[in-house]
Amino acid sequence: MKLGFYPKLAADSIKKNKKLYLPYILTCCGISAMQYIMFYLSDYTENSGMTGGRIITTTLNYGIIIIVIFSIIFLNYSNSFLLRRRQKEFGIYNILGMSKKNIAHIYLWENIIIYLISTVSGITMGIAFSKLAELLLARLIKDNISYDFTLNKDLVLVCAAVSAFIFLLLFVRGIIALWKLNTLSLMKSENFGEKPPKANYLIAVIGVLMLCVAYYIALTTEKPLDALVMFFVAVILVVIGTYMIFIAGSVTMCKILQKNKKYYYQKDHFVAVSSMAYRMKRNGAGLASVCILITMVLVMMFGAGSLYIGAEDSLHTTYPRDFTFVMYAGGDQETANENFNVFCNDIDEFFINHNDNRKDIQKYTYAHYNMNVTDNVFDRGFDKPADKYAEVYFISLADYNKYCGENKVLEDNQVLINTIYTQYSYSNLIIGGESYVIREFVPTDDLFPNRDKAYLTPKIYIIANDINKIISGFDNEITHHTKFIYRFNSSLSQDKQCRMFNDLYNNMVANNNRGKYGSGTSWAIESLAFDRADFYGIYGGIFFLGIILSALFLVATVLIIYFKQIAEGYEDESRFTVMKKIGMTNREIQKNVNSQMKTVFILPLAFAILHLCFAAPIIMRMLTIFSVENTSLILITMAVIVAIFRVFYITVYKITSNVYYEIVSKSKI
């Protein structure tokens, strides 16, 4: 055969089947563009000096892995669908004298043509939109914006190589599938339909039970660490349960409707129900896949959106003041207090020299221990099970009243307490052999920021008149476990605070090296302005990745729906032809189409929203790890995301229903 025979035949086949191949090629273009953008941003954030670049690069690299894996899985599904639609055509080639080797040549050139078109177009799109993506990322992480345009040739080659690898896998998978078929199966494969399965109540009930268990987990899991683990257990149960309900439950529903003769034998319902029942097993699996993808998009955008929108609240919760200084002092209590005063005086001098009028100053001391808590007895023993331990904080009543705006009064044998991630139901507590009456439970967030919750261990805060007296009963090295806190807000701009942070740190290091703060002393500095970059690097990077992955899953959802509707349209074409011959008009056909399509489309969206509503509590528990706890803001974010997606979904419904109708009616609407 002539050299250009196979490429020409492959190109003609693609043109002839453009209704199938155009969405597929556009999807491949979009995936190639996303891959290039992710590679570009990963390289840019690593080498450009962008604030929080290291964290963002790591986040984007995880995103690249997810995109490549999902691309392989999804394009394999799409390619399998195209092969199924093309097998009759390949069968004709076989009857006309072509061997499977010849057909493989055609299939090879089809893949080469699609690869070249999609990769060149996709990378071109990626290059064109890479700067826009960079600007979006810079805005999300609140970094300086650069309008310089760069083209990295190495990234173009890497992206082309990744796409080539994916298409090679698709080609090998397709050749194996074609090689297993004989001429008769090639000719009839398009007509092979799955037999209507019998209603399986057992599978449907198991599916419902799985969803109930998953919902129960989501509603009852309290601790963020448990939520992080149990969330994935719930996800697995939801995925399996959804498939069971859509496959078995939808079949059962159709069988029940068919038994209802008054309903079933109306012309508005007869065609829709019978056609759905004929292929319901495959239809149910397809609907379940769409439902899972929609749920992934909603959950991802809900979580990432809530995280980013609540970032500023989270930042100020994590850093209650612009500057926080923590000192761990050695020596006896008196010496430790003297060293802390010297430490604070140096800080004061530094900020005065920088013309900073500080405000909202807090200066206090607390003791921190890991203790065994058995019933109402607190001790320092380490011979108990791990679940009996808690972090216990001791702070003086004077400091509590001063910085929490209270005026509490306690007797020497009385204490105030607060607990996180543990329940304490006793009216007293015993420490060092002494019993103390619990007067009341009080909030302590003004002294201990909510970020301490991220450590996920049980915490008990104890406020007393004299904490040294309490802890002296079980600790001879009191200062070894004592922390001195000095924090305040700055009158300087965020930029000035960032610029002077390194000078401040170096000044404190120099003083410490000279032994100015005593032996055995260590300290730490926290700056809200300086740490903001890394903070938004994490939150902005996660939100950006959520946007990219959601876009990818949306493309997959649309293409699955589109392919599904084309397949069902061709399968229903002969049935509607019969209906037209017995007198059904195009208007009646469209009415039947709408009846079927509304049923098919509303179920995945309805179940996805249901999944999201039950997932919201456990997602909110996980968000507390990042100190995002504004419930009203989180719920508003969820409502907005659902509303936006609903509009998008309805648009997809209208487009795909028109495609389906054009096929079954053989006339334009």
Task: Provide a role label for each language-model segment.
Residues 2-5, 180-194, 570-571, 661-669:
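Short cytosolic juxtamembrane segments of multi-pass membrane proteins
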